[in-house]
Amino acid sequence: MSKIYHNIGVLAHVDSGKTTLTEQLLYLTGVVRNAGSVDSGTAATDNLSIERKRGISVRTSTASAEWNGVTINIIDTPGHIDFAGEVERSLCALDYAIVIVSAVEGVRAHTENIMRALDEANLPRLVFINKIDRAGADSEAVIAELSSLAKCPLLPLTVCRDEGLDSYSCAMKTGDDFSAAVTEALCETCPEAEEAFLSDEILHNENYALIVQIWLIS
């Protein structure tokens, strides 16, 4: 039986928490015993001495993790606009992208460049809003900004409470209203999903995986 591989790029404007998220993914999948830190120079994907010294990524690096029988190649790209060429070269190798945006600073210049590049490459993406616990965090404002850039509907998957506080919490959205919003968004952008919905193939929560799979493959 052949192995399944997915190449997932992590992209963001500098200082949005890109490498920190990568470290957490490696930790949660058991690749590293302790999550590294950019500030302390212990991040697994910051291999160059200049990266450890300056606390920024200057070239694309890759780390692999296993999850539920799937090999995930996490591709950590530089966030500084001076190294945008590294990001652009990595896109041809990606299956999906995670775009990280700070809940405090919001959409920044390089964020817009990244979103446009992903549109041109026709790459599916997940937006991860980071720094929810920082003072001034406003995820709804960030979603509104991103919606003006996106060519398809943006659907928040979680509800955040007490933003800007250490006691913040996030929970997955559920319920009929969310079910209807997901189905409507998919039908607007994916003819195959609309056809399946109209033929009663997709009507219930348990079929969301099928809806999303159709959307991503298309």
Where are each of the predicted segments found?
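P-loop NTPase switch module centered on the Walker A-proximal segment
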Residues: 1-101, 105-107, 141, 148-152, ...
